[in-house]
Curated annotation (Swiss-Prot):
Gene: atpFH
Subunit structure, interactors included: F-type ATPases have 2 components, F(1) - the catalytic core - and F(0) - the membrane proton channel. F(1) has five subunits: alpha(3), beta(3), gamma(1), delta(1), epsilon(1). F(0) has three main subunits: a(1), b(2) and c(10-14). The alpha and beta chains form an alternating ring which encloses part of the gamma chain. F(1) is attached to F(0) by a central stalk formed by the gamma and epsilon chains, while a peripheral stalk is formed by the delta and b chains.
Functional note: F(1)F(0) ATP synthase produces ATP from ADP in the presence of a proton or sodium gradient. F-type ATPases consist of two structural domains, F(1) containing the extramembraneous catalytic core and F(0) containing the membrane proton channel, linked together by a central stalk and a peripheral stalk. During catalysis, ATP synthesis in the catalytic domain of F(1) is coupled via a rotary mechanism of the central stalk subunits to proton translocation. This fusion protein includes a component of the F(0) channel (subunit b) and of the F(1) subunit (subunit delta). Two copies of subunit b and one of delta together form the peripheral 'stator' stalk which links F(1) to F(0).
CDD domains with a match to the protein in the record: ATP-synt_Fo_b
Location(s), subcellular: Cell membrane
Species per Swiss-Prot/TrEMBL record: Mycolicibacterium gilvum (strain PYR-GCK)
Protein name per Swiss-Prot or TrEMBL: ATP synthase subunit b-delta
Gene3D superfamilies in UniProt: N-terminal domain of the delta subunit of the F1F0-ATP synthase
GO cellular component: plasma membrane; proton-transporting ATP synthase complex
UniProt KW keywords: ATP synthesis, Cell membrane, CF(0), Hydrogen ion transport, Ion transport, Membrane, Multifunctional enzyme, Transmembrane, Transmembrane helix, Transport
GO MF term list: proton-transporting ATP synthase activity, rotational mechanism
Amino acid sequence: MSTFIGQLIGFAVIVFIIMKWVAPLVKSMMQKQQEAIRAALEESAEASKKLAEADAMHTKAVEDAKSEGQKVTDEARQDSERITAQLAEQADTEAERIKSQGAQQVQLMRQQLIRQLRSGLGAESVEKAEEIVRNYVSDPAAQASTVDRFLEELNAMAPSPAVLEAGATLNLRAASREALAELVKKFESVADGADSDTLTTVADELSGVAKVLLSETTLNKHLAEPTDDSTAKTRLVERLFDGKLGSNSLELLKTATAQRWSSEGNLIDALEHVARLALLARAERDGQSEEVEDQLFRFGRLLDSQSQLSRLLADTTVPTDKRVELLKKVVDSAGEVNGTVAALLTQTVELLRGEPADAAVSDLAELAVARRGEAVAEVTAAADLSEEQRTRLTEILSRIYGTPVSVQLDVDPDVLGGLLITVGDEVIDGSISSRLAAARTGLPD
């Protein structure tokens, strides 16, 4: 019995120990294990849910991929069809362009070939024609016949509407033209009955005054300034030039300064013009007008052919005395030169103010002819004209221009035949050389 009780107590102690310490520990461990299992189950459920969602998303992604792939395929097919159509259209357009360019190129090559053939044949034709013409005009009689034919053509021309002017009036405005006319009128009254020495004095003195005004620009400005009352300018002229100029020159200078000039330089132009008229009037008194006219034209043609000489004579950077010295050397080398011509040329060179020397001498020659009431016709021919041809040409030109015409002939074999005529600003070109040149110019490039 005691054994049983001892065992029962031992069992009770064991149960107490188990319940006191072991059971809570086991219970805690079991709860933890249950929590772990529960968490594992929840995680498993969540994982299953996520897996299901992933499967759904995968399925949807696959469907979307299929749909997008189909869309891309459709778009690619459409792009392919569009590109194919565009390439076909571009190919057609390019083919048409190439075809058109090819046709244009063929046409261009055809035209170039035709032009080359025409140019070659045309040049050969012109050269052959020139050879034939040169052979023809080598005969003086045949060359003269070309002049006669041109005179027949010229005879049929209508009268020219050109107004021929010469000398200083060419570059003047209306006011200065009227002023110059008054001054020339005064000169004519002074020159009427004057002898050669008086005219020479007037020419020298007026030329000297012009040179003074060129160097004294302030004085020139004052004397040329337009005023309603010229009394002050007249008194100034008397105070400066009385006793230094002859009575005729002084009266002419007073008349000049009393006029209204368009510009200051026109007063000098007018004095130079009247000084020239005085020398030309002297030539008339001495019966040398035609000789003076002829020598002036010859010197003008010399300057035309010697451009360097013309530039040297007109170079205002060179002192005037040096240019006059050069002129005298040229005049002396030309042989016997009329004294009036030498004086006119010297006066012209001394008063050059920027214009070319050849143009100034040409104006001087035209003034010499205009002084005799004639127009000047500068005629270029391949050979000298016969007296009959010269007379007929003079008659025809006088009838065309309605005024007596003086013919100045220049012989140039390069003209070949016919005539080249210049009257004032009008040119009548009937030379064979110009016709050949026109034919050569008209050839295609």
